[in-house]
């Protein structure tokens, strides 16, 4: 598992050295529902990735980040731990217009907190580009765990940093 994570991180950073498109940096807030709605009040996360234009209306890349679910506090009850994930995913976005995109991320979410093994990660997204590099997006996050599913509805902001190769 450590070797897989090390290989993925190495590929991510090496790809960024030769990248010509953009590095994506973002934050999002989430509201859990279904299996975790009683234990987790809300969650927040950061997103980091790289997208490359495959054509005029399609981007593909890789995304990673961190998701933290904040537990509900019960009076006099046992304190619950935060629920934490590190998603590693392939990402695709389709741009039907200059400002509207839809797509998704699919991969593996590694569980960080004790007793959390992680699971299959998927995140369909709809985004609206305002300005040249900033996007607001609405998404659903699903992480298929053993016997439960982490489900959240998310609102986030994503900023693109243009990476251009140096000319010799």
Where is each model-derived feature located?
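Membrane-embedded beta-strand positions of outer-membrane beta-barrel proteins
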Residues: 25-29, 60-64, 90-92, 102-104, ...
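Cleavable N-terminal export/targeting peptides
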Residues: 1-22, 165-168
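Predominantly the C-terminal beta-signal and adjacent terminal strand-loop region
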Residues: 24, 70, 117-168
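Outer-membrane beta-barrel strand-turn architecture
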Residues: 17, 52-56, 94-100, 130-132, ...
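Glycine- and aromatic-enriched membrane insertion/assembly motifs of diderm outer-membrane
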Residues: 33, 37-89, 95, 135
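Mid-chain, well-packed structural core segment of small domains
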Residues: 95-119
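Short glycine/proline- and aromatic-enriched beta-strand/turn motifs that initiate or cap beta-hairpins
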Residues: 19-61, 150-168
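Transmembrane beta-strands of outer-membrane beta-barrel pores
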Residues: 29-35, 52, 64-72, 106-112, ...
């Amino acid at each position: 598992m450590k070797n897989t994570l090390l290989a993925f991180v190495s590929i991510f950073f090496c790809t960024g050295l030769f990248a010509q498109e953009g590095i994506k940096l973002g934050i999002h807030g989430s509201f859990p529902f279904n299996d975790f709605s009683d234990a987790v009040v809300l969650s927040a996360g950061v997103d980091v990735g790289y997208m490359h234009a495959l054509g005029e209306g399609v981007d593909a890349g890789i995304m990673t980040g961190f998701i933290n679910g904040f537990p509900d506090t019960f009076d006099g009850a046992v304190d619950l731990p935060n629920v934490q994930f590190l998603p590693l995913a392939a990402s695709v976005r389709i741009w039907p217009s200059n400002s509207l995109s839809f797509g998704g991320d699919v991969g593996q979410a590694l569980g960080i907190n004790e007793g959390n093994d992680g699971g299959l990660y998927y995140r369909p997204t709809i985004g609206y580009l305002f300005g040249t590099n900033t996007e607001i997006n609405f998404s659903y996050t699903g992480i298929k765990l053993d016997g439960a599913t982490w489900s959240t509805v998310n609102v986030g902001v994503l900023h693109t940093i243009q990476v251009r190769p140096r000319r010799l």
